[in-house]
Amino acid sequence: AFVIAAADIDLAAGKPQAAALRLRALLDVNPGNHPLTMAYANALLRNGRPKDAQRVLVEHSRRKPDDPQVWYELAETHGLAGSIIDVHRARAEYFILNGALDLAERQLGYALDLARSDFHTTASVQARIADIREMREEIKL
């Protein structure tokens, strides 16, 4: 908690690089720590490194796939990194975790529209849409 507070002070003082370095050092000895990882990604964003923050949060989403806050932050980070298809995919995961299946499916529809020329992404998005429809059917039972 102290390191995160110190990093917050660095950020408030306009020293995002110092905050990122401080948090990275502690993550090296506490890999996968949720609060440290989220704070580190934020420090990277504030340091103008959205692609690095994106990489950190994508990896973290694999460790914490059921955490809506991770998906929310990841969607925002994808946007800042210019990965618009991934914005919609991350938003969909956020909505799924919050029980908003219609909104999730809509987000995946947007992703599908953007991914038409990418077979792998299209197939993956279509599979997730099928998952949502299956979830909806299970709810009706």
Kindly give the residue locations of the regions a language model identified:
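Alpha-helical linker/edge segments of TPR/alpha-solenoid repeat scaffolds
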Residues: 50, 80-90, 130-141
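Terminal, low-structured helical/coil segments at or just beyond the last alpha-helical repeat
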Residues: 94-141
